[in-house]
């Protein structure tokens, strides 16, 4: 029997995938799995029993990923599960930035008691006029799950779409429309495009990547959209660019005191994945990842350990080992198993940066003594009997 705990409400459609071998717990005590959306986990004390954390969403800033890796806790996210919801909001943001739809709606609300509001509307509508997005140039920084969907949708609406992503995956490239043009540098993006939308993860290398230098290279009157992470944009430089007219509109999904209330900024309260469909898709993917890991030892979409798949566990003794990616580890593992008279039927070892993961199918179950010996190896963080 496995136990899981939800730190946030998780869509029931996902939880329904758990079978009778899983029990929902009210606390973290004795849980093997944790499901989370936005709850802050950096100051949480996790029990030794926790083997996996699944984030029902893409960003993992609220999870101490490195600390989890040190403890052998595999952290999953659900890339692409909320992509369509974010894509649709990006498109809405482009339209709202192109015409003063919000201002027009607010005007109607203010003047709703005027008897001749219909005639007033005809006189006042010019102040809310704007431009169409058809034929405009859109630059997309980052062509992952969301960026590629935005690219295809914008192209279908008649925009001239350019994409920049030096790390684009094969799958994402295959899914792009042939009409999407490739930009080889950020300088090309900044200098040519009418609209720029950012879809990259928040890393040390991307923090405040949209800065004063970047704004200086952009076309006058550019529209900037950020539905990825708030810290990708240097907001002090942004305010200067808005006040000078370099940036016409900034549309973001991240509210704070700097951007809220500025007339050149449209802010939504983190609505990107706030759709029923996105929440369900994220929950379903997260639960499937948890089950495959706990029942088979397989890893897919982990942010701190490598992908690893040995299929459905049918062996008498499959063990999963998280450890440092250091020399001589495999020989130490196999030496202990051999000394215990345990024959290896199948085995795989994968690494990701500082950390590695080993799955071993044995022809017979490992003894408690053998498992303790594996755990005692320097660099091994967790040894788990899958079956």
Regions found by a protein language model. Name each.
Residues 136, 143-144:
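Glycine-rich Rossmann-fold phosphate-binding loop(s) that bind the pyrophosphate
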Residues 1-78, 211-213, 223, 234, ...:
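An N-terminal-biased, well-structured beta-alpha scaffold segment characteristic
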Residues 42-44, 166-258, 274:
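Rossmann-like adenosine-cofactor binding region
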Residues 250, 263, 271-387:
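NAD(P)-dependent dehydrogenase/reductase Rossmann-like domain
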